[in-house]
C-alpha cells in the first residue's frame, strides 16, 4: 500500500511538481510474529501511526494535493471535461464537493469549483467512463477501485487494514492507493485518549496515574506501571487482564494495593510497621518495608507470598474471641463467666475469673514464624500468659490477689521488695517470649471476678465500706485543701497590702530627703555666692581705697539717717568743714560706681 504514490507520470507544471515533492509514506504494517522484539527497544506511537504530511496546509492546498495524488497516472486521459457538449452537462455541485468517476475502473477525482462539467464522450467501445457522484471534500472517507481518501478527525486514530494487516492513521487527510485497503467508517475511528486501543494485533495502553496493568505476551506475564508515554505492542499474543466484569474505565488495578499477583510476578508493598512473609523454594524469606519507596517485584514461580505480619505494638485481650468461641463449642451449656473469663483456683481453694491485657511487639519475625508459625504466635502468647498467671494465682490467697490487683504493675510501693503478681508473671513471661522473637511490653489483669457468690457479696460489702471511707477521706482532704487555699490567699493578700504601704512610706521619705537635699544645696550655693561677692568686694576696696572710705561713710550715713543733729552756733563753722556736708555727693558717686560694676 502506498499513500500518495504511483507509477511514472507525465510532465506537470511547477505547482504539480511542488505538490509531488512532499514526502510520500508507505504504511508501516508490522508483523505480529515478534519481529519487533529484536533488542530491548520499545515500540512508540510514531513507529506505528501513519502521520498526514499535509495536515497543516491550507484548505486549497489540501484539495490540490488530494487531487494530484488521487489522480496520479491519469495525465491527459481524464474522465471529466469542463466544456460539456450540448445536452451532456451534469448537475452543478457546490464548491465544497469533489466529483468522482472512473475510466475502465480507474477512479478519478475532479473539482468543478461550482462550474458546469460532464464526463468525456469517447467513440472507443473499449473505454467505459462512468460518473460515480459528488463527494464532500471534508467527508471522513470516500474512494473506489483501490483509491481512497481518509480524513481523520482531530484527536482520533483511524483503524484500517492493508494486506490483511492492521494499520493506524493519525489525524488529518490521507490519500491511499492500495487495492487491499479496508476501512469501516462506522467503527473505524477511535479517540486517542482511550485507555486501551485494540486493533487486531496493535495494542496501545495508556495507564493512568495511580494504576497498573496486568498483561500477557505469549506465556510471559508483565505488570506495567503508570507513565506519561503509552505502551505500544504489536503482537497477536498480547492480552490485557482486567478485573472480572470491569468496564473500560476500570481496566487497571490500583497501584496502592499491598499485594498484586500476576502469573509468576508478585508485586508487594509492605507498609511501615509490618513485613511481608514469603517462601523462596520453601525457605522463609522476610521482606521489610523498602527504603526507596518502590514496590518489591518478585518474578519467580517458586517464590510464593504468604501474607503480612505486624511488627508494631499490639494489644490483645485474653481470652481471645477464638478461645471464647471454642469454649462455647465445647460446652453449649456453659455460663457467661465460664466463656468470657479464664477461671483459676487460689491457694485457699476459691475460684476467680480473670481477663488479661497483653501488649507485645514482634522484634524478630523470622524467628517467631520459624518456631511458632504465622497463625500460632497469638495462640502461644495467650496460652503461656494464662499458664504463668494461673501458676501465680494458685500460689496466692484471694486476699493477696485482691491486694496486688489494687496496685498497677510497675507502680511504686512502700516496700521495694514487694512485687505485684502481674510484675512477677511479666518478668517470667518476657523471658519466655524473648526466645521466640517477641518483646513483652505490658501484662495486666484487666478484670478479676470472684465466682463464689457469698464471698463475692462480702467482698462487695467491704468494697462499699471502703468506698464510703475513701469518699469521706477524699471529702476531708478536699476541705483541708480548700481551707489551706483560703489561708494562703488571705496571707498573700495581706502581704500585698503591707508591701504597698511600705512602698508608699519609702516613696514619701525619698521625696522628703530629695527636697531637703535640694534646699541644702541651695543654701550652699547662696553662701558660696555671698563669699565670692565678699571676696570680690574686698579685692575692689584693696585696689581702690577711696571706695572703702565711701562705703564707711555710707554706713555712717545709714546710721545717722534717722538721727537729729543739734548744732550750736559755736560749732557751725566746724560743721561746714565736716564730710557730712558732702554726703549726698558721695552717695551719688557711689551709685555711679556700682552701676559701672554691674
From Swiss-Prot:
Compartments, record wording: Endosome membrane; Lysosome
Lineage, opening ranks: Eukaryota, Amoebozoa, Evosea, Eumycetozoa, Dictyostelia
Protein name: Vacuolin-A
Coiled-coil stretches noted in the UniProt entry, renumbered to this chain: 482-539
GO biological process: establishment of protein localization to plasma membrane; phagocytosis, recognition; phagosome maturation; regulation of DNA-templated transcription; response to bacterium
Family label: Belongs to the vacuolin family.
CDD domains, sorted: SPFH_like
Pfam families: Band_7
Keywords annotated in UniProt: Coiled coil, Endosome, Lysosome, Membrane
GO cellular component, one term: phagolysosome
Membrane topology: Peripheral membrane protein
Family matches, as Gene3D superfamilies: Band 7 domain
